[in-house]
């Protein structure tokens, strides 16, 4: 039986509400995950794998619409098409008044790219989708092999589309702490089409080992490295302002949720640093 999705709609979750109004040519609010394989991608098999994946995650069949007072997501029977990569990474996906899907699957040589407009999902939801997409592709590409399951069969469509913000929101307001104005990085702000990309490949095992040696998580270690990198660029005469970093936190680590919609929040880190001549051990952090 064919599923009827055309009349289904839902409000944007709490974290997604800011994205539609803030998106534009200078900030597309698109992020990318990719998977690098060891052989060239076969486009026809990737297309079939995408269609199989979409059957299990109808939340990705939604388009963004603008109502009288707010934006909302509406489910549409639009085909998702795989394309060979041609545009710069994280190019614009959401175009106002255009009924288009809010993600794009592309490929380049041995790489499968998955780009998504942030109003649709967060990093956790996007990673689950990409994992199943790659799994379906490998099963089609190598039917003689056995692959482990990515998705839990017990989870339902309702679980994936749950607005966990509404479910766990208590209405309790915490007292806000006053924050000092942070140091602003200087430099030329490039248009999206002129974006410069620096790609760095790190050994996950090596990074985890470094983080463990410092007694912190990988997230904390990388955040500290980024703060230190900013610190090194600050003129010593302007060290009075703190270096601030906004780190996204996956709320699924604190509340039970299988939702593939946005369920995250920010943690603000502010570091007031004094200039000292760094020792070789200190500089190892930036490596």
Question: What does each model-identified segment do?
Answer:
Residues 1-69, 78-104, 208, 232-277, ...:
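Acyl-thioester-dependent acyl-group transfer interface
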Residues 2-14, 120-128, 132-209, 242:
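Non-catalytic, low-complexity flexible loops and terminal extensions
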Residues 30-32, 111, 197:
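Intrinsic-disorder/low-complexity, polar/charged segments enriched in Ser/Thr/Lys/Arg/Asp/Glu/Gln
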Residues 38-57, 115-131, 197-235:
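Acyl activation and transfer enzymes in specialized metabolism, enriched
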Residues 69-71, 112:
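Hydrophobic residues embedded in beta-strands of well-ordered beta-sheets
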Residues 112, 219, 243:
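Alpha-helical scaffolds flanking conserved acidic
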Residues 278-282:
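Short, small-residue-biased leader/transition segments that mark boundaries at the very start
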């Amino acid at each position: 039986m064919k599923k009827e999705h055309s009349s289904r709609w839902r409000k944007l979750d709490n974290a997604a509400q800011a994205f539609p109004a803030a998106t534009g040519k200078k900030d597309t609010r698109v992020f990318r995950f990719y998977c690098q394989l060891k052989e060239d991608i076969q486009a026809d098999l990737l297309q079939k794998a995408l269609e199989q994946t979409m059957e299990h995650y109808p939340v990705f069949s939604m388009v963004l619409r603008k109502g009288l007072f707010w934006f909302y997501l509406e489910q549409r029977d639009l085909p998702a098409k795989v394309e060979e990569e041609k545009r710069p990474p994280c190019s614009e996906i959401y175009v106002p008044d255009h009924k288009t899907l809010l993600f794009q699957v592309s490929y380049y040589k041995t790489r499968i790219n998955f780009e998504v407009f942030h109003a649709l999902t967060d990093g956790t939801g996007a990673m689950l989708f990409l994992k199943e997409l790659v799994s379906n592709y490998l099963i089609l590409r190598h039917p003689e092999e056995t692959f482990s399951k990515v998705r839990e069969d017990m989870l339902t469509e309702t679980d994936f589309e749950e607005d966990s913000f509404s479910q766990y929101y208590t209405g309790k307001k915490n007292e806000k702490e006053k924050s000092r104005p942070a140091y602003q990085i200087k430099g030329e702000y490039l248009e999206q089409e002129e974006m410069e990309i620096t790609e760095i490949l790190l050994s996950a095992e090596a990074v985890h080992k470094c983080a463990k040696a410092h007694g912190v998580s990988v997230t904390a270690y990388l955040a500290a490295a980024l703060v230190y990198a900013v610190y090194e660029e600050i003129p010593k005469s302007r060290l009075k302002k703190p270096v601030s970093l906004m780190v996204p936190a996956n709320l699924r680590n604190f509340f039970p949720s299988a939702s593939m919609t946005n369920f995250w929040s920010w943690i603000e880190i502010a570091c007031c640093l004094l200039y000292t001549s760094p020792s070789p051990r200190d500089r190892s952090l930036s490596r």
